[in-house]
Amino acid sequence: MTQVTVVCGPPCSGKTTWVREHAQPGDLIVDYDDIAVRLGSPQSHHHHPSMHGKIEAVISRAIAGIKDGRHERAWIIRSGVARAHELAAELGGTVVVIDEPDDVLFARADRRPDSAVTKRAIVEWRAANISRRA
């Protein structure tokens, strides 16, 4: 059976960094942003809406592979806490919430070329997830 860790948290919290620090060679990493870039997105975040269906199709295939036991360990990065818990329950995995204080998140957002969009996404994430963080 595959060991699955679903990692969630607001934009700029360090989800991808945390997974890269904990994953081992050969582990499957399912990361929306990484998939988008591999599919041709010119930016690392906030991809064109037309790409969403293609990205989710790749994620669905990866999840099917996890269910089929094709991987020893898998890491799935999803932003929302509720969806992370749903996936973990579906796959028999665990959830890790990566978070930082807002001042840290906003400082990291300032280093992105799309800082205003990222800051808005942080605020929206907080509004949608604040009561579901654990």
Question: Model segments located where?
Answer:
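Pre-Walker A (Motif I) flank of P-loop NTPase domains
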Residues: 1-5, 71-72
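Conserved GTP-binding G-domain of TRAFAC-class P-loop NTPases and closely related GTPase folds
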Residues: 4, 8, 106-134
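Hydrophobic/aromatic beta-strand patches that form the interior of the parallel beta-sheet core
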Residues: 5, 28-30, 94-96
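Conserved glycine(s) of the Walker
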Residues: 14-15
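Hydrophobic positions on the alpha1 helix immediately C-terminal to the Walker A/P-loop
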Residues: 18
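Active-site signature of alpha/beta-hydrolase-fold catalytic machinery across serine-
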Residues: 21
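Conserved nucleotide-sensing/catalytic segment adjacent to the nucleotide-binding pocket
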Residues: 24-91
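Conserved phosphate-donor/acceptor-positioning beta-strand/loop module used by diverse small-molecule
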Residues: 77-79, 90-109
